[in-house]
Amino acid sequence: MEIFHQAIWLIPVLPLSASMLSGIGLLTFRETTSDLRRLHGALAIGAMALSFVVSLGVLWNQLHGIAPVRWIIEWMLTDTFRLEIGYWVDPLTSTMLVVVTSVALLVMIYSDEYMHVDEGYVRFFVYLSIFTTSMLGLVLSPNLVQVYGFWELVGMCSYLLVGFWFTRPTAAEASQKAFITNRVGDFGLLLGILALYWMTGSFEFASIADRLGDLLIAIPSLRTIACIACILVFMGPIAKSAQFPLHVWLPDAMEGPTPISALIHAATMVAAGVFLVARMFPVFDQLPLVMELIAWTGTLTAFLGATMALTQSDIKKGLAYSTMSQLGYMIMALGTGAYSEALFHLTTHAYSKALLFLAAGSVIHGMEPVVGFSPMQNQNMHRMGGLRKYMPLTAMTFLLGTCSICGIPPLACFWSKDAILAEVFATHPTCWLIAWLTAGMTGFYMFRIYFLTFEGSFRSDLGRAKPKESHLGMVAPLIILAIPTVAIGSLGTPFAPVWETFVHAPGQLSSLDEEFDLAEFLEMAGSSVGIGLLGISLSSLMYRNYAIDATRISEYFSPLNRLFASKWYIDDLYAQVIVQGTRTIAQTLLIFDQRIIDGAVNLTAFGTLSAADTLKYWENGRVQFYILSIIFGVLFGSWLLTTHLSSL
């Protein structure tokens, strides 16, 4: 199996090659390429399938004890500076490679049917392949410089894909919002990388951690600077993983095609932030203040995301806020030292959320013939209802994903979320309490989405065509994703913790030697499942059995309802303070430029013209006038000279 480690470089190169071939064809032979559109889709799918096979081989080797692989070449070398590029494969890398390639492959298979009538079909697959290549390159990066390069490529691709339907004003605005919001975090990340290099003289992850540890022992006063540098680095994941307060771009990103929403929310863009925090964990772990900040950022994000999801009527935005909340769990876990548990939840959530988004795309696809192609209609859950009768496979797979996200045993996310809550309870009880309440809200809003969409009666019966089950090309990926949604959690059970033995923080040993406490497990699992079931029960009473009037409840809690529906007014605050403030400053500077700067220049020009206009009368062509002027000039000069001499 050594051949797979020798072929690691093919994992990002294969999808990159497919995107380049299709992209060049689209630029040079547009009509021919469009005529062969399905062939280009097959090329992208085939390249991703090969990358997935190689990734599986790499993971197999890592599982069987092959040492981590580090291959680098010196790209820039001077007497005082050395920059290397290459790849680094360890258990974290090999796991992420499989997650990214498997989800991307299924998204591409799904997209082949979902996008087949779209005129931008080939362009979509070009962007999709570059997007996946960027994430694979980021995962393989051995140092912060290479990470930053691929980090920016991921951001660029998200801009292209969120704004894929750029003729829609909402899509164009959403892509700009995502791009600009992420630039804020990326600027902090760049400053943090440079600060860490200034302190340690290295961009390598392991070297930074070791050298920083030595520096903090030798020069304790550097701790403040180190904290600032690490917080700046953390700004990148805050934006990329949609953490408070830079989370505002994520719901708007739903303006892109649904397959892209699945990929962004499952295995690429938002996962990049969690991955970077995990890579930098040995550095952050030396600074308790930074770890506390990370833990509380994740906790607040999990809570805020859940509250915002409670009132959503758009199925994709409801799932988007769910992603924001679950990412908060992962960041909280990393901040509290639960490294293995956070990455386990990243993996289980990736498959469950990809399943949910692709199932939502199937619903939207089925609603389009009934209510039209406007997202305001075909994504509105209040226009749905009773779809389980028309789309049984979609409903079944969506229900599996919903139960998994809610933490219902024995589905995948139960094991990872329960492990996070158990670890957080031991070190940060307040964070645990907030996360525990969030688990209850998760059960409520996730089943609210399911009940509004699939249960009850169909609420858009306009005498037109009924929704139909999607084509096999879209349903098959849902069925395949249902398998890891059910089964992958078995890797991280406390009875046989395969995951923890394989993925743990660098320099730390797994906790296999700790004796399993069944009573403690049942207590923690019972509390998390219990609060989740309470949320599900309330949701059922309100949106399935209608025993509780949801409208009256929202009216009774009107202030809270408005607060959650308005997304805690955070977007409004940014719009008024930052956007409108920037515009006001720009308009003020424009007025200053036009009236002061331009006015001064124009006044000088006017004065010159006036002087010239006055002097032109002295050039009248009459000799006697010139003689008279000379006489007056001589007399005036003589008077000045006489006056000056008499004063001496």
Curated annotation (Swiss-Prot):
UniProt GO BP: ATP synthesis coupled electron transport; electron transport coupled proton transport
An example Gene Ontology CC term for this record: chloroplast thylakoid membrane
EC number: 7.1.1.-
Main location: plastid
Functional summary from the UniProt entry: NDH shuttles electrons from NAD(P)H:plastoquinone, via FMN and iron-sulfur (Fe-S) centers, to quinones in the photosynthetic chain and possibly in a chloroplast respiratory chain. The immediate electron acceptor for the enzyme in this species is believed to be plastoquinone. Couples the redox reaction to proton translocation, and thus conserves the redox energy in a proton gradient.
MF annotations from Gene Ontology: NADH dehydrogenase (ubiquinone) activity; quinone binding
Segments crossing the lipid bilayer: 7-27, 39-59, 89-109, 124-144, 147-167, 189-209, 215-235, 258-278, 289-309, 327-347, 354-374, 395-415, 432-452, 472-492, 518-538, 625-645
NCBIfam families (alphabetical): NDH_I_L (TIGR01974), PRK06590.1 (NF005141)
Name of the featured protein: NAD(P)H-quinone oxidoreductase subunit 5, chloroplastic
Gene it is expressed from: ndhF
